[in-house]
């Protein structure tokens, strides 16, 4: 089935008149510099076109932007050989100077910050402060654009305010600046958004096609980032998410398919199977968390499988009774072919700390880019050098 699927994609590609250029985007979480010891210089930037810096926060009292961690953002000495550089943003700026196609986008908000956006859009003064400080941040700290990560507007009034927010940013920001959103995959959240109105002001959409299922809210084991079909717990899949946005008027080239560089763990699972109940019991030797980076799975799992129909992978540890679902290299390659066949804009990952080295055969971004046709088919428009 996997080979048939790949052949189908390739047949559709054969009829395209020109080779499109693709975006490869990845979120960099600023807290990764601590426990994970993951720094900007560790990102294989030859495989990425856009880096999304997560997260910039909003001051609830004023509506102005603020750093979530000023120490690591601006002051923390970088590792060798870049000890003379202080702060992640300065390091990224130096990387941009040497790699003029690399773009850095500030991602504002993130999970658990919806109340901050609600506070901003409900007060005219805060709204003005937000827009003006966003422009100041972009110009001062060397960003190429703004990513709004409002998870999520709760009703049509807030959805209209999000449109207004995007419109005001687009009006004030120089046209060279990129504006994006982290867009939901769940149908309830999608239906609230005013997609066509938002699309007028957006450069592209980052579709969060992951976390379709998880131990904290699912009743059965499931793939959490499957491309097709029922994932085991519900009917969510990435292909349907993409089609929903297309049906609502977004051009495919503006859609960026989001993928995980982490797995979701289900504890208390009797056997390596999707769609079965689990107890959440954490046995000795298990991974305590319900999320783990792709590069931290370890070698305790004694069973691995890949579903070519749904495009999802799993590992299972029969001793600790834990099952993990994730994207493996086959998923990365099939999703790359899917993006080509559907003429989408590219791929996105959360987050950069999760992948294995590009020297490892299982490197997700390298497999993805190689399947697209190599780094030669990646977008190469120039970045902005200002600030910092």
Curated annotation (Swiss-Prot):
Residues binding chitin, per UniProt: 82-83, 109-112, 152, 208-211, 350
Sorted alphabetically, which InterPro entries does this protein's record hold? Chitinase_II/V-like_cat, Chitinase_insertion_sf, Glyco_hydro18_cat, Glyco_hydro_18_chit_AS, Glycoside_hydrolase_SF, Glycosyl_Hydrlase_18
EC number, as in UniProt: 3.2.1.14
Question: One GO biological process from the UniProt record?
Answer: chitin catabolic process
Which reaction does this enzyme catalyse, per its entry?
Random endo-hydrolysis of N-acetyl-beta-D-glucosaminide (1->4)-beta-linkages in chitin and chitodextrins
User: One cellular component GO annotation, for this chain's record?
Assistant: extracellular region
Question: Where does the record place the GH18 domain?
Answer: 22-375
**Which residues are glycosylated according to the annotation?**
30, 82, 123, 132, 155, 237
Q: Where in the cell is it found?
A: Secreted
Q: Where along the chain is the active site annotated?
A: 151
Q: Name one GO molecular function term.
A: endochitinase activity
Q: Name one Pfam family in it.
A: Glyco_hydro_18
Please provide the record's keywords in A-Z order.
Carbohydrate metabolism, Chitin degradation, Chitin-binding, Glycoprotein, Glycosidase, Hydrolase, Polysaccharide degradation, Secreted, Sporulation
Role description:
Chitinase involved in the remodeling of chitin in the fungal cell wall. Plays a role in sporulation.
The entry assigns this protein to a family as follows: Belongs to the glycosyl hydrolase 18 family. Chitinase class V subfamily.
Name under which the protein is recorded: Chitinase 4
Query: What is the native source organism of this protein?
Result: Candida albicans (strain SC5314 / ATCC MYA-2876) (Yeast)
Give me the gene this protein comes from: CHT4
């Amino acid at each position: 089935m996997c080979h048939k699927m790949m052949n189908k994609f390739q047949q559709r590609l054969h009829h395209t008149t020109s080779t499109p250029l693709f975006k490869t985007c990845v979120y960099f979480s600023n807290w990764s510099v601590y426990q994970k010891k993951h720094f900007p210089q560790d990102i294989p930037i030859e495989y990425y076109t856009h880096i999304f810096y997560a997260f910039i926060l909003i001051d609830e009292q004023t509506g102005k932007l603020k750093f979530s961690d000023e120490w690591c953002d601006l002051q923390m000495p970088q590792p060798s050989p870049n000890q003379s550089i202080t702060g992640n943003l300065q390091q990224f700026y130096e990387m941009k100077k040497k790699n003029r196609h690399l773009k850095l986008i500030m991602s504002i908000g993130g999970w658990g910050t919806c109340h901050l956006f609600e506070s901003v859009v409900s007060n005219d003064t805060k709204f003005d402060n937000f827009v003006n400080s966003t422009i100041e941040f972009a110009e001062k700290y060397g960003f190429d654009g703004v990513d709004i990560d409002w998870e999520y507007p709760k009703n049509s009034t807030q959805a209209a305010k999000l449109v207004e927010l995007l419109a005001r940013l687009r009006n004030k920001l120089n046209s060279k600046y990129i504006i994006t959103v982290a867009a939901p995959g769940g149908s309830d959240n999608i239906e609230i958004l005013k997609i066509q109105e938002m699309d007028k002001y957006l450069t592209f959409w980052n579709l969060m096609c992951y976390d379709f299922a998880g131990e904290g809210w699912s009743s059965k084991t499931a793939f959490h980032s499957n491309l097709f079909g029922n994932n085991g717990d519900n009917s969510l899949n990435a292909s349907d998410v993409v089609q929903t946005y297309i049906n609502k008027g977004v051009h495919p080239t503006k859609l960026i398919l989001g993928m995980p560089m982490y797995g979701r763990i289900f504890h208390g699972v009797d056997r390596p199977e999707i769609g079965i109940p689990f107890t959440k019991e954490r046995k000795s030797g298990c991974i305590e968390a319900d999320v783990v980076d792709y590069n931290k799975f370890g070698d305790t799992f004694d069973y691995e499988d890949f579903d070519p129909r749904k495009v999802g992978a799993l590992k299972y540890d029969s001793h600790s009774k834990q099952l993990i679902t994730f994207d493996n290299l086959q998923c990365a390659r099939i999703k790359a072919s899917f993006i080509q066949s559907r003429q989408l804009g590219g791929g996105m990952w959360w987050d950069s700390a999760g992948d294995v080295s590009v020297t490892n055969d299982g490197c997700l971004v390298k497999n993805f880019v190689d399947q697209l046709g190599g780094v030669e088919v990646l977008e190469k428009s120039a970045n902005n050098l200002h600030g910092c």
